């Protein structure tokens, strides 16, 4: 029995058509399955909680949607030790699929799930912050971040332009347009960053800090090109003390991972990091908003989730 959680609104509704094709294949092969559809933001978390809270044996749970849908399901899984996770990417960015080397073609992704040839136990990141004096925890599979990149994520969630571009399969361009708009509004902050090995750094003007569990975020940006999601560590990229024009340049070459050795860029690898800023800045987890924060903590939970993959990555 396979359990599917489907976000029919993914990529401006294109996922609904993809699910129809997938369901046709399942019925043709007489494969037993159950399907649940998300209907609003956060629904994937509630569905995952309901479906996994009483599990006592291995169950294959398959997500059909974008990175945001994966994040919602991840935050709802009650017993990860009983879950085998499959993923059919239907979003506009699909960074999680890129990092896992999963097929972008939905039918090929389904074939991989139905006839898996390898598995990988992946790390999960955990973001901790406060909201109205309440401590919040949000898990992530791809990345979390604070500052300019998170501001772009916030706007992408509500952007009508992204919806329009998704309909003509140009959704990735929306990030470029949003970046230019947010650049005019962006204000860097002084920050202090502490790592689990005792190292501490301060920057006068932090533009953003990206904490990554795998190489890709934001539709393909490679801010931490050497990040691996099965090494028990997180990779951190900080862009600081540069002009807005150079910030834009560094982000542009960040698509190829060419920025890491340039002035104004620092990278670290760690198991835990604490970030404090002089003023609240936007925060995201897998592109989902965690609003404005001036203090966050991020940790890595090693080998927490079993994934169906096309190949095994050696540590």
State the predicted function of each range.
Residues 1-61, 71, 108, 118, ...:
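ATP/NTP phosphate-donor binding region
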Residues 8, 64-66, 90:
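Glycine-rich beta-strand-to-loop/alpha-helix junction loops that act as flexible
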Residues 15, 195-197, 203, 222-315:
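ATP/nucleoside-binding phosphotransfer catalytic cores, i.e., glycine-rich phosphate-binding loops
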Residues 19-22, 52, 78, 157-161, ...:
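Short, solvent-exposed amphipathic alpha-helical segments in soluble enzyme
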Residues 29, 79-86, 91-205:
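Catalytic core of DAGKc-family lipid kinases
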Residues 69-81:
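Short Gly/Thr/Asp-enriched flexible loops that form oxyanion-binding sites at enzyme active sites
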Residues 145, 149, 208-224:
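Glycine-rich phosphate/pyrophosphate-binding beta-alpha loops
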